[in-house]
């Protein structure tokens, strides 16, 4: 009780009575009005700046600020002090006592003018969006009302991010073109791209939208549920959303559908070979309808963000008969396209990435027919993308050494390894890397040619200039980690609470900071 009383007493203390100037002094405001100087108002203002900087002043620090401000006002030897001069005095006092608050005060003191400019920019952009549209992102249809609303909000969010998250140096680097901060309209809210662990979410059932979903018992239900999971979870992030090794995810549900169909035909007294053939045909049909359903859903149903999520699936390494059937059927559906008869064309989503292993897909190998289906699809549609697991480079090295597949997040972003026990570095020779269930918190691009030109123009070492911008990016990412770490698991329940992300079995009220340790942040 005593500590609370002392705290309340300190908050209510009037420093204006304790620290007074030598004479009666007035502060001249921007509108020309005058107000009697009272240092207590300074304490109130800097207290708000300290709060924005996530800190607070001690009683001694407040007294230091008061004494400094009153002394400087006395030194002016005037009866009226313009508000800009008063701001400079207060800022100088904060630099002496707590520099981090000085920056917060400096950034915020002209907030009225900044907000007028900011809202004017947002208004101009909103008018353009409402009557002309927006062509910045091909994934968003700016003709739709829901998308227009989302784009206007994004413009406001971008302005707020630039004003209150980026430092002066970072803003200048962006304006000069040396760095580019991707997705400024969304970075304050959530993460970028991911390899979502759909299998982990499905296993044993899960909760979505306050409704409990049992684990699917058939393939057609699995397709429906996975489609719902993908659209719901992808709406809570802004980057590419990948379902890795989808053939292996669907395989056990195809097995369940097959057993169910086989039992049905056996009950009808059908011959064993006919029952097996018909059961396989039923499963094939479920695969066809399921993949067609995904193509329609992912290309026509916009997310709650107002865009069509960049959804990717990878497949091709499953050797079981139903895993093979999954990959081949998916490629056939993409090759045939969607639309009116005689006017069908391939859709965009989900983007398909074929995982090629020369020991599985080469001539005479177990998955040669899967490879041929991929080649035929590529010849007609330019899909799928091909990712070699046994060639050269980082992805192949991880596959050869650990047997782990590094699927792309979206189209081109690959996760660096995170080891089960060692974290960033393997604990020993038996430590295994984890990729599925991990994500990236944001990307910042470097303009290397411009940095080289700057180094030459200023006769400086290229790496010295490069290090300056790399350090800017590092500090930006560090602040992003700290900021996102304060978010609650309720912001993306499927990822943080139902197992979509690595370690994602938090309570809704838990902070997500523990999950960020395996997340990456990218300079491109």
Name these PLM-found stretches.
Residues 122-522:
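Conserved catalytic cores of very large enzyme subunits
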Residues 2-130:
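Charged, amphipathic alpha-helical regulatory modules used
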């Amino acid at each position: 009780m005593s500590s609370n009383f002392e705290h309340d007493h300190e908050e209510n203390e009037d420093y204006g009575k304790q620290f007074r100037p030598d004479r009666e002094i007035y502060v001249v405001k921007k509108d020309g009005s005058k107000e009697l100087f009272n240092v207590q108002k300074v304490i109130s203002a800097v207290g708000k700046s300290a709060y924005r900087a996530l800190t607070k002043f001690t009683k001694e620090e407040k007294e230091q600020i008061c004494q400094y401000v009153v002394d400087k006002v006395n030194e002016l030897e005037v009866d009226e002090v313009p508000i800009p001069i008063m701001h400079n005095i207060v800022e100088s006092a904060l630099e002496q006592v707590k520099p981090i608050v000085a920056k917060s005060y400096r950034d915020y003191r002209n907030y009225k003018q900044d907000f007028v400019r900011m809202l004017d920019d947002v208004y101009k952009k909103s008018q353009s969006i409402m009557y002309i549209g927006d062509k910045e992102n091909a994934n968003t249809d700016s003709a739709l009302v829901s998308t227009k609303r989302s784009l206007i909000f994004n413009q406001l969010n971008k302005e707020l991010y630039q004003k209150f998250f980026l430092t002066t140096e970072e803003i200048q680097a962006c304006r000069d073109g040396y760095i580019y901060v991707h997705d400024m309209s969304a970075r304050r809210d959530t993460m970028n791209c991911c390899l979502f662990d759909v299998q982990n979410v499905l296993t044993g059932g899960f909760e979505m939208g306050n409704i409990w979903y049992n684990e699917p018992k058939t393939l057609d239900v699995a397709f429906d549920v996975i489609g719902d999971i993908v659209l719901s979870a992808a709406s809570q992030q802004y980057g590419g959303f990948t379902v890795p090794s989808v053939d292996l995810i669907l395989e056990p549900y195809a097995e369940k559908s097959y057993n169910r169909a086989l039992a049905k035909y056996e009950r009808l007294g059908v011959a064993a070979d006919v029952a097996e053939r018909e059961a396989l045909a039923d499963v094939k049909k479920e695969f066809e309808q399921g993949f067609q359903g995904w193509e329609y859903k992912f290309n026509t149903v916009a997310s709650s963000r107002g865009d069509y999520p960049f959804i990717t699936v990878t497949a091709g390494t499953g050797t079981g008969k139903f895993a093979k059937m999954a990959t081949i059927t998916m490629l056939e559906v993409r090759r045939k396209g969607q639309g009116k008869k005689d006017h069908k064309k391939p859709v965009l989503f989900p983007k398909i990435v074929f995982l090629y292993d020369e020991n599985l897909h080469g001539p005479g190998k177990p998955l040669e027919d899967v490879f041929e289906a991929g080649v035929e699809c590529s010849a007609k549609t330019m899909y799928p993308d091909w990712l070699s697991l046994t060639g050269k480079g980082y992805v192949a090295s991880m596959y050869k050494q650990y047997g782990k597949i590094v699927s792309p997040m979206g189209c081109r972003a690959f996760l660096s390894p995170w080891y089960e026990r060692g974290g960033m570095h393997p604990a020993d020779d038996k430590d295994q890397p984890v990729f599925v269930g991990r994500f990236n918190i944001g990307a910042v691009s470097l303009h290397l040619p411009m940095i080289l030109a700057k180094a030459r123009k200023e006769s400086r070492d290229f790496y010295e200039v490069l290090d300056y911008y790399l350090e800017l990016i590092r500090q930006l990412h560090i602040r992003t980690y700290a900021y996102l770490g304060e978010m609650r698991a309720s912001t993306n329940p499927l990822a943080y609470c139902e197992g979509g992300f690595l370690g994602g079995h938090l309570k809704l009220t838990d902070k997500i900071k523990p999950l960020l340790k395996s997340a990456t942040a990218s300079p491109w």
